[in-house]
A protein has these predicted regions:
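Loop/turn elements at helix/coil->beta-strand transitions in domains of secreted/extracellular proteins
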Residues: 45-49, 76-81, 136-141, 185-192, ...
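N-terminal Sec-pathway targeting helices
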Residues: 2-15
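Histidine-centered active-site loop/cap adjacent to the catalytic His
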Residues: 252-302
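Substrate-gating cap/lid alpha-helix
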Residues: 196-241, 278
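Conserved SGNH/GDSL esterase-like catalytic core that processes O-acyl groups on lipids
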Residues: 58-60, 64-166
């Protein structure tokens, strides 16, 4: 039986039982990614160079004994480097808010920054790295803003702005739309957006949820290439039953069980994801990254930038 039909029948049965016995049930919303064939969650056959643009949340995520992302990526055949505060030309490593991405990959990009990013092979955080550098440039670029970027003003369904960068839903959509112009010229690279983690405060939580759902479900609908992907780090941290993962042969984006605020904050007043949340994200992300990588490679990417 078709998996989607089976899931729907199961949900109807559970809902019916709830009605009969007077129970109030919350059923998950499960988005299933469109698939062009088999999905391959296996590690690359040969080491692949990867760089991660981040700040403190990413540093914790990479760290051994916390999120273990760096070590896990290495075990999956990725040679991992990273940027952090103070990194790079003009100290651009300090600037990783959504409004800053145009300086990296948008209309304000700088060739010196990009050359440094693609060539970087150092570790700017602490994590185990046992692989030898396979040479060449970084092929995969992960980039993430931190949790203050979940405080987006405006309304959940606001359309993209036409100009200007600020901390609103409209502006955030504009920024990511503008990035696609550059990404289309760099089909020789795989760019992976890591969504900003959630806040504990719920004031703008509905906006954060709507924006990240837009990134996962709508942003790339009309983008014709396979060199851009999204991992919903935000969603994985909003409830133990929320997932963005490879499950039962499908990529699932499971929402709607819990709320839109952080369930894995380090402490009251500190929204850095804790070790449990960071490890959950690692477990869900790495198989997806493998899928993104194989899908990109199967598309026959060019070896040089596209003019």
């Amino acid at each position: 039986m078709n998996k989607k039909l089976l899931r729907s029948l199961r949900a109807v049965f559970v809902l019916g039982v709830g009605v009969i016995f007077g129970l109030t049930l919350v059923l998950p919303t499960i988005g299933v990614a469109a698939q062009d064939g088999g999905l391959d969650p296996s590690s690359p056959d040969e080491p692949v160079r990867l760089i991660f643009i981040h700040h403190s949340t990413g540093e914790n995520w990479l760290r051994d004994g916390y999120g273990n992302l760096g070590r896990t990526l290495g075990e999956s055949n990725y040679f991992v480097s990273d940027t952090n505060y103070g990194w790079g030309p003009y100290g651009i490593g300090d600037s990783t808010d959504i409004v800053n991405w145009p300086q990296w990959f948008g209309p304000e990009r700088d060739d010196q920054v990009l050359a440094a990013l693609f060539g970087e092979s150092a570790q700017n955080s602490e994590y185990t790295r046992n692989l030898s550098n396979p040479g060449g440039e970084n092929e995969i670029i992960l980039f993430k803003s931190c949790f203050p970027n979940s405080e987006l003003r405006g309304n959940p369904n606001d359309p993209p702005a036409s100009s200007g960068y600020d901390y609103t839903v409209r502006s955030a959509k504009l920024v990511y739309n503008e990035l696609l112009d550059y990404f289309a010229t760099r089909q020789d690279k795989l760019f992976v957006v890591i969504t900003a983690p959630p806040l504990s405060d719920g004031t703008y939580a509905n906006n954060a949820r709507a924006f990240n759902n837009w990134l996962v479900n709508e942003w790339l609908q009309d983008y014709p290439y396979q060199n851009v992907a999204v991992f919903d780090f935000y969603n994985t941290l909003t409830d133990p039953q929320h997932h963005h993962w490879f499950n039962n042969g499908e990529i699932e984006h499971v929402t709607g069980v819990g709320g839109n605020t952080s369930k894995y904050a380090s402490s009251q007043g500190d929204d850095h994801p804790n070790a449990a949340g960071s490890q959950k994200a690692t477990d869900e992300f790495v198989p997806l990254l493998n899928i993104f990588y194989h899908r990109w490679q199967a598309s026959g990417p060019p070896s040089e930038p596209v003019s």
